[in-house]
């Protein structure tokens, strides 16, 4: 009887590991079906006690694996652009831009996970699936990300994603009007405007 219980536990562990692997593979396969897209988004940031910290909206352009333009239009404008080599962050209000190497950007942030869709990045997470909804938990608790959830259709359309930090703060993004089409290359280039202070960390 004891041997049977041990065998059942072992088999259950194998099935669970297989399910996690299948969920991760399915998520990667779905994301890989759309190589470039444009969408508008809304943002809602809440604290651990549910209080609204910030609400905003903006536009997003992506061309996988390493090109993206994240343009927050409200409440305050900011731009995050990758040209494939350099990651640019621009804040028009304070007239400051920061440049860092994209290769040094961490792969454990939700946005980098979505835009890169790199198998090595996904290996750092346990992935559970329920229909179109995927829940990711970091295998290492050393980072600031506690949990990440994303909803993706079988055709590769991202409907929403949510990041929960270790302190309980939740950032939820809902994508709408997503268009899977070729994005103009100019969306992925950035030149600091005249008068802007550049913090070049490359």
Swiss-Prot record:
One of its GO terms (cellular component) is outer membrane-bounded periplasmic space. It is found in: Periplasm. Gene3D superfamilies: Lipoprotein localisation LolA/LolB/LppX (2.50.20.10). GO terms for biological process: lipoprotein localization to outer membrane; lipoprotein transport. The keyword Repeat does not apply. The keyword Lipid metabolism does not apply. It holds the Pfam family LolA. Keywords: Chaperone, Periplasm, Protein transport, Signal, Transport. Residues 1-21 form the signal peptide. CDD domains: LolA (cd16325). Disulfide bonds: none annotated. Belongs to the LolA family. Monomer. Participates in the translocation of lipoproteins from the inner membrane to the outer membrane. Only forms a complex with a lipoprotein if the residue after the N-terminal Cys is not an aspartate (The Asp acts as a targeting signal to indicate that the lipoprotein should stay in the inner membrane). This is Outer-membrane lipoprotein carrier protein.
